[in-house]
Amino acid sequence: MRIGFLGPKASFTYAAATAAFPEDQHELIPFETITEVIRSYERDLVDFAIVPVENSIEGSVHQTIDYLFLQADNLHTQAEIILPIRQQLMATDNQKKIEKIFSHPQAIAQSLKYIQEHMPDVKLEPTDSTAYAAQFVAQHPNKPFAAIAPVASSIEYGLTIIAHDIQEIHENYTRFWVLGKTRPQLNLVADTQKITLALTLPDNLPGALYKALKVFADFGINLSKIESRPLKTFLGEYFFLVDAVYSGDYLYLLNALEKLGVTVKQLGRYKVYKM
């Protein structure tokens, strides 16, 4: 099968992709941005698309969430891969003084405390992925550049790690979603099963959010996450992203929500695999 992922090779998404779909059995195809990864599936260029959705330090990856809610149709999360994230600061061998650090905005934010303490004057430059940052630094060996990226990137692009595990906390994890129309057969042991719904509440009704969430409580369904995101229509209008740990039939849940006037978009029902 063809698997689209946020590249280039040796990115964290690449690690999640190879954990679920070993490279000796599947064709892994890198794309430069999250949007391009998802669109590659929509254009039938790949069989599954893998994108980051949430980090334990920095929260949701809004580019993923917003695209799936606002633009994607007939595309659902079919599996979730949870990957431990260790951020490394790397450069070419001949760099003695670093003036600019490149990385994905999430990686920069996860490592900001270290940077502020040890390199307060350095300039920070966002890139589309951590691996692309490492690749760019390797392509400019005579520039005073460094990248924040995984260990695999230092190996892939011939860089030297100058500071190890610079993320703010040790327990740093990222959730990756496997997007598609069918559930993949993965040679992994599932940790649990979840559903993700996007709820749009009826306008200007007092207690609308409370009533919607009460439906989950009434059916004994445990929520693991709730987050508001702007509808990008008018100021103050939101949809609510809800994750619930649940493995049973949930059609009755959808019916109960819709009776309250809640518009429900199903983003996925999937097994969770923790690496």
Can you describe what each PLM-predicted range is?
Residues 1-275:
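Domain-level signature for soluble enzymes in the chorismate/prephenate branch of the shikimate pathway
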